[in-house]
A protein has these predicted regions:
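Conserved beta-strand-loop-alpha-helix junction that forms the acyl-donor binding cleft
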Residues: 77, 102-112, 235, 264-274, ...
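C-terminal "cap" of GNAT-fold acetyltransferases
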Residues: 128-156, 260, 265-271, 280-297
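Acyl-donor-binding surface of acyltransferase catalytic domains
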Residues: 59, 66-69, 74-145, 291
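Short amphipathic alpha-helix that is part of the acyltransferase structural core
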Residues: 1-38, 52, 141-175
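Active-site rim helix/loop that mediates acceptor-substrate recognition in acyltransferases
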Residues: 19-62, 172-201, 208
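Conserved beta-strand in the GNAT
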Residues: 50-52, 57-69, 198, 206-216, ...
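Conserved acetyl-CoA-binding loop-helix of GNAT-fold acetyltransferases
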Residues: 78-92, 230-235, 239-256, 274-279
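Hydrophobic adenine-recognition pocket in adenosine-nucleotide-binding enzymes
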Residues: 7, 72, 231-233, 266
Length: 297
């Protein structure tokens, strides 16, 4: 029997197996298996956002639109599971009210052919940029009228959501923030408040105007890699050099913790951010295309 149903916590091991087998056949460029499997945490935290495909009692595929993912086990492809999962993804995206469905699709091969046949359209790409180890980045300096401090988990959650919502309101790809998601991130065992930096008005530590989060990977990674995960500045405080200084803080932070390489991802349509990162010495190393499908109709 071939069927679809909502994801449950009990499906996590089977979905991980699908992730592993799909990754072995060809995962996203410059993404490690450990990073790919990190999607399990989000699935377990939000099972209502995902669906699985079944053959009999076996999970052979899954989709998690919030993470732009749809994967089918390589041995069970070309049996209609992808098409059914795409329908489920479309319904999940419509229910979430987040606009058109977006999925990561490889640049070529059967994944792209599937997307085209399903009526999806290429929208844009995220570029993975990497800072070469030999590149010298200046130390961050203060911006006039602005001070910085670490985040206070619990105490800053609502203010950070408001800041990020306003800072990314004009972002080319919709970004959604909530107090619940922020609290979940802060509750993870690997969360360190020192990895996040809040920029605020110098005379008011509660008036937040910018944000940066930068982390390092597992100590077992060789070489140890840093990741500037997010840089955001309120529109009214842009063009003062604050984004550049927050970026430089992130680079300095992960290098102080031993990172040899520093990565960040940027939406190709975010031209001003892309210019900044390239000017600071980052170079493109991978492309992650995103394709869309309207959820209405």
């Amino acid at each position: 029997m071939i069927a679809l149903r909502p994801f449950t916590h009990a499906d996590a091991p089977a979905v991980e197996a699908v992730m592993r087998r799909s990754f072995a056949l060809g995962g996203p460029e410059a993404v490690t298996l450990a990073e790919h499997l990190g999607g399990i945490d989000d699935l377990v935290a939000h099972p209502e956002e995902a669906a699985v495909a079944l053959e009999g009692d076996m999970v052979v595929g899954y989709t998690h639109p919030a993470a732009v993912r749809l994967e089918v086990d390589p041995d069970h492809r070309r049996r209609g599971h992808g098409r059914r999962l795409l329908g489920a993804a479309r319904r999940l995206a419509a229910g979430a009210g987040d606009g058109p469905l977006e999925l990561w699709v490889p640049r070529d091969g059967p994944g792209r052919a599937f997307a085209e046949a399903a009526g999806m359209r290429y929208r844009s790409s995220f570029h993975l940029l990497r800072l070469p180890r030999e590149t010298v980045v200046p130390e961050p300096v203060d911006v006039a009228g602005i001070a910085c401090r670490p985040i206070r988990p619990g105490g800053d959650d609502a203010a950070v959501v408001a800041l990020l919502t306003d800072a990314f309101a004009d972002h080319p790809s919709p970004m959604h923030f909530s107090v619940e998601r922020i609290a979940e991130a802060h509750a993870r065992p690997d969360f360190d408040p020192e990895d996040a930096r809040l920029a605020h008005a110098a005379d008011d530590p509660h008036q937040l105007v910018g944000f940066c989060r930068a982390t390092t990977g597992s100590a077992s990674d060789t070489p140890l890699r840093g990741d500037v995960r997010l840089v955001g500045v309120l529109p009214a405080f842009r063009r003062r050099g604050l984004g550049r200084e927050l970026l430089r803080w992130g680079v300095a932070h992960v290098r102080e913790r031993g990172a040899v390489e520093v990565d960040l991802a940027v939406e190709a349509l975010n031209a001003s951010a892309l210019r900044l990162y390239l000017a600071e010495g980052f170079a493109p190393v991978a492309e992650w295309p995103r394709w869309t499908l309207e959820t209405a109709g």
